[in-house]
Amino acid sequence: MAGNPFKGRDVISITDFTRGDLELLFRQADVIESKAGSKPLDGKVVALAFFEPSTRTRLSFETAVKRLGGSTLLISGEEAISVAKGENLADTITMLDSYADAIVIRHRYEGAALYAAEVAEKPVINGGDGRQHHPTQAMLDLYTVYSLFGTVDGLTYGVLGDLRYGRAASSFILGLSLFNPRHVYLISPPQLRARREVLEALEKRGVPYTEVERLQDVLGELDVLYVTRIQKERIPDPREYESLRGSYRVTLDLLESFAKESLKVLHPLPRVDEIDFSVDSSRYQAYFTQARLGVRVRMALMNLVMRG
């Protein structure tokens, strides 16, 4: 593909890309399933190096690669634990770089994906590192909005929950900064407010935002509500987690009382108790659509990066 900005490129942060790059990805995602029959990744191998537990992201990448005719090498579970205890990460990445045509890495340490990209010659895709970045999640989240509304621009967004430790929420907010939202409400307890660098990205690009604590105060304005769980595994003090757990709960009664009928609720999953099951069969629910579209977006991304 002429003018493909993804070909052979590392995917470390959503902010490494432009709005135009993402719009190209969206167009490719719209048609990628019709191309899958030609097996564009036939003969290609993707290493999935998951040093942190994952179900959805790993299966989504694995499905995406296999639908395109490629194959995967998986490091997870006991293999990842033994590597974490002994072998140097650089040695592991060097080994995978010799076996595979691309590497997807997920790691609990911030900066691990960038480090892997510096070591490897093949493209490295960040499947989530620490609390910092989860670019492919942001890509599929933005694509979901695009699919539902036909645009990412001009909408009012609410991002709810753990905005301090949650990498999916941070990446989504950073992704929104590449577009032109009407307004972004950042809804969280004071202890879990968005980090300064995330706010600075919004400010730098002139995206209007407001930090609030009560969902009910802004729910009626929202076109999209992006809900995240409290990140138990990233909050250092268990007592702090217990005090914050259950800070927000989105129920069908709440939505029917305050929200627009056209509101769509997104969630990167897994959820704990922040969205009641009553929402699942309502007109507001879009998180299962979001999960389904994730495979399509990752198919488009892997095809663009590995084949062009």
From Swiss-Prot:
Binding sites annotated in the UniProt record for carbamoyl phosphate: R56, T57, R106, H134, Q137, L269, P270
GO-annotated molecular function: amino acid binding; aspartate carbamoyltransferase activity
A Pfam family hit: OTCace_N
Positions bound to L-aspartate: K85, R167, R229
Record-listed E.C. numbers: 2.1.3.2
GO biological-process terms attached to the record: 'de novo' pyrimidine nucleobase biosynthetic process; 'de novo' UMP biosynthetic process; amino acid metabolic process
Gene3D superfamilies given in the database record: Aspartate/ornithine carbamoyltransferase
Associated pathway: Pyrimidine metabolism; UMP biosynthesis via de novo pathway; (S)-dihydroorotate from bicarbonate: step 2/3
Catalytic activity entry: carbamoyl phosphate + L-aspartate = N-carbamoyl-L-aspartate + phosphate + H(+)
Keyword line: Pyrimidine biosynthesis, Transferase
InterPro entries given in the database record: Asp/Orn_carbamoyltranf_P-bd, Asp/Orn_carbamoylTrfase, Asp/Orn_carbamoylTrfase_sf, Asp_carbamoyltransf, Asp_carbamoyltransf_Asp/Orn-bd
Family: Belongs to the aspartate/ornithine carbamoyltransferase superfamily. ATCase family.
Subunit-structure text: Heterooligomer of catalytic and regulatory chains.
Function: Catalyzes the condensation of carbamoyl phosphate and aspartate to form carbamoyl aspartate and inorganic phosphate, the committed step in the de novo pyrimidine nucleotide biosynthesis pathway.
HAMAP family: Asp_carb_tr
Name of protein: Aspartate carbamoyltransferase catalytic subunit
Name of the gene: pyrB
